[in-house]
């Protein structure tokens, strides 16, 4: 039960850190290559 409570307390923290890193990475890629994410039809 103690391990489960530890998991519940660390998973949101790890998720927040991972999403922050991913968002920052996408923003930096979009800063250097601004047209990379655009779709042209």
From Swiss-Prot:
Its main location: plastid. The chain crosses the membrane at residues 7-27. It is a single-pass membrane protein. GO terms for cellular component: chloroplast thylakoid membrane; photosystem I. Keywords: Chloroplast, Membrane, Photosynthesis, Photosystem I, Plastid, Thylakoid, Transmembrane, Transmembrane helix. NCBIfam families: PRK02733.1 (NF002743). This is Photosystem I reaction center subunit IX. It comes from Phaeodactylum tricornutum (strain CCAP 1055/1). The lineage of its organism: Eukaryota, Sar, Stramenopiles, Ochrophyta, Bacillariophyta.
């Amino acid at each position: 039960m103690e391990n489960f409570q530890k998991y519940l307390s660390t998973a949101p923290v790890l998720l927040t850190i991972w999403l922050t890193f991913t968002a920052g990475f996408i923003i930096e890629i979009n800063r250097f290559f601004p047209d990379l994410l655009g779709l042209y039809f």
